[in-house]
């Protein structure tokens, strides 16, 4: 007789499909919202990941994919999606002055107004639970008063000329400030039909829209008569001359447009960007290579020393040498920043007492770079030492015994046996270390902040900047505005450079050991 296994209520198919249906509706709603807001890339990504997840968890045939999907979704969301966004921004003029869409920038400009008529002093007087608005003309001495009204909506108030003062005490500045938004929504209509609106905390004045949108998409300045046309090459409304050519004036805010390869060509054609970019690229490669070499060399030598059988207190030495790895790197970096202080740092005090010198660690490019390499070696050698300590255990003692019988010394053992046997398994880790130091943002940012600065550059750049720090400074610290498009272009180039260097290193390693 077949045994029918009883299902719990939470295992029922009805509940499963209900939950999946609700999730599908929620995802659909979010995708529509993103699409309506113009966030097309976010909408597409959410739709793809959510649809794939719902299909995998709803279909029994895709059961095996349930174990793979979370990792793939995470990689797509946190690796591929930011990469695609960065590359997409690199082909636009997206910056602090060009963040809005064309429609939103046009709306902001059309909302601007200018004072085009008389100015009237105003007062606000209580009328029970309501208020009365009183205006006075300083030139003619005429007074105008509205009927009682309540705050809370856009409204038009018809004012009448009066000679009597309103009853009650005039509202003070605090009350006016608290109701400033409501007062800004009021349009006061004078007996002659002129309309005035609040222009300051004490005045109403005749205001008109500063710009008028013409049928051909041109904006006309109602105050000066200048016409502006959208220039989709630069993403601004730009003035046009009488003969139809572009003028010099641009209206802010601008809007985001596609610029093609402009940001990439700027990197190689604009001397103010090209020179610091190439110099920073060379320094980044040199910094990464020297750091990898020194950390591996120091770590390997120390690992051999603490594994030496004749050494007493090896456990204590191991703990002391691994301590830099246990301390968070940002704490160590800030401590070194104090130690290297040019005026009060302990390192300069010691060098001054012993040799009579006080290096300018933060103002001289050479000593600043030397300081970075010293600090980075201190931070990186414990990791390499731990790896080498583990790898040394895998080297058979027979090799050293045989070399001892041949009369080999410690140096011959190290260069003929230890180094060749350690360098092969360390190679992939050295490549990973190179890639990490190529983008070692935290060290530069906390220790030198890229300084000392380079002179005569279009973008902010320093002698100790790595490419990633240079990109950050362009995006967030530019004196002429934050240029996200150019920063994204440089970030894309960094991605290609790191990827190419990693591929070359891997192929070179494979050729060497094959």
Swiss-Prot record:
Recorded topology in the membrane: Multi-pass membrane protein
Gene3D superfamilies reported for this sequence: D-maltodextrin-binding protein, MBP, MalF N-terminal region-like, MetI-like
Coiled coil region boundaries: none
Segments on the Periplasmic side according to the record's topology features: 37-39, 93-283, 342-369, 436-483
Any GO BP annotation: maltodextrin transmembrane transport
InterPro entries associated with the record: MalF_N (IPR035277), MalF_N_TM (IPR048464), MalF_P2 (IPR029345), MalF_P2_sf (IPR047103), MetI-like (IPR000515), MetI-like_sf (IPR035906)
Location(s), subcellular: Cell inner membrane
Pfam families attached to this UniProt entry: BPD_transp_1 (PF00528), MalF_N_TM (PF20872), MalF_P2 (PF14785)
Keywords: Cell inner membrane, Cell membrane, Membrane, Sugar transport, Transmembrane, Transmembrane helix, Transport
Keyword check for Hydrolase: no
Topological domain spans for side Cytoplasmic: 1-16, 58-69, 307-318, 393-412, 507-514
Chain ranges passing through the membrane: 17-36, 40-57, 70-92, 284-306, 319-341, 370-392, 413-435, 484-506
Keyword set includes Transmembrane: yes
Cellular component GO terms held in the UniProt record: maltose transport complex
Principal subcellular localization: membrane
Sample GO molecular function, one term: ABC-type maltose transporter activity
Quaternary structure and partners: The complex is composed of two ATP-binding proteins (MalK), two transmembrane proteins (MalG and MalF) and a solute-binding protein (MalE).
Family: Belongs to the binding-protein-dependent transport system permease family. MalFG subfamily.
Function: Part of the ABC transporter complex MalEFGK involved in maltose/maltodextrin import. Probably responsible for the translocation of the substrate across the membrane.
Name of the featured protein: Maltose/maltodextrin transport system permease protein MalF
Source species of the chain: Escherichia coli O157:H7
Gene name, Swiss-Prot/TrEMBL: malF
């Amino acid at each position: 007789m077949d045994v029918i296994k009883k299902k719990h209520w939470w295992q029922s198919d009805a509940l499963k499909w209900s939950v999946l249906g609700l999730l599908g509706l929620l995802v659909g709603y979010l995708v529509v919202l993103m699409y309506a807001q113009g966030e097309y890339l976010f909408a597409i990504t959410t739709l793809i990941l959510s649809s794939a997840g719902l299909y995998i968890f709803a279909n029994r045939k895709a059961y095996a994919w349930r174990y793979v999907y979370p990792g793939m979704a995470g990689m797509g969301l946190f690796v591929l999606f930011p990469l695609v966004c960065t590359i997409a921004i690199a082909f636009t003029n997206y910056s602090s002055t060009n963040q809005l869409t064309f429609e939103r920038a046009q709306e902001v400009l059309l909302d601007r107004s200018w004072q085009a008529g008389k100015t009237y002093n105003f007062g606000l007087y209580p009328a029970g639970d309501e208020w009365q608005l009183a205006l006075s003309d300083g030139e003619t001495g005429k007074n105008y008063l509205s009927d009682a009204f309540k705050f809370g909506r856009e409204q038009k108030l018809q004012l009448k000329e009066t000679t009597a003062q309103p009853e009650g005490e005039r509202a003070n500045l605090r009350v006016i400030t608290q109701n400033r938004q409501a007062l800004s929504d009021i349009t006061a209509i004078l007996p002659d039909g002129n309309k005035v609106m609040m222009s300051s905390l004490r005045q109403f004045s005749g205001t008109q829209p500063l710009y008028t949108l013409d049928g051909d998409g041109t904006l006309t300045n109602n105050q000066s008569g200048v016409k502006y046309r959208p220039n989709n090459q630069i993403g601004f409304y730009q003035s046009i001359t009488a003969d139809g050519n572009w003028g010099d004036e641009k209206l802010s805010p601008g809007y985001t447009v596609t610029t093609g390869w402009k940001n990439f060509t700027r990197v190689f054609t604009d001397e103010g960007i090209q020179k610091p970019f190439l110099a920073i690229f060379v320094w980044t490669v040199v910094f990464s290579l020297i750091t990898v070499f020194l950390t591996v060399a120091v770590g390997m030598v120390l690992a051999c020393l603490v594994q030496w059988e004749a050494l007493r207190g090896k456990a204590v030495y191991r703990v002391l040498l691994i301590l830099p790895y246990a301390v968070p790197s940002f704490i160590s970096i800030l401590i070194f920043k104090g130690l290297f202080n040019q005026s009060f740092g302990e390192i300069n005090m010691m060098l001054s007492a012993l040799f009579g010198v006080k290096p300018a660690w933060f103002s001289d490019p050479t000593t600043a770079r030397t300081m970075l390499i010293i600090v980075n070696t201190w931070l990186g050698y414990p990791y390499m030492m731990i790896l080498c300590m583990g790898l040394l255990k895998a080297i058979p003692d027979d090799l050293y015994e045989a070399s001892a019988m041949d009369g080999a010394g410690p140096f011959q053992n190290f260069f003929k046996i230890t180094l060749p046997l350690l360098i092969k398994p360390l190679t992939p880790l050295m490549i990973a270390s190179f890639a990490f130091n190529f983008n070692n943002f935290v060290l530069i940012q906390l220790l030198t902040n890229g300084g000392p600065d380079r002179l005569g550059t279009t973008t902010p750049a320093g002698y100790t900047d790595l490419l990633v720090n240079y990109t950050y400074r362009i995006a967030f610290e530019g004196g002429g505005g934050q240029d996200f498009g150019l920063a994204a272009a440089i970030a894309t180039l960094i991605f290609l450079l790191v990827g190419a260097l990693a591929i070359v290193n891997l192929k070179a390693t494979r050729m060497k050991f094959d």
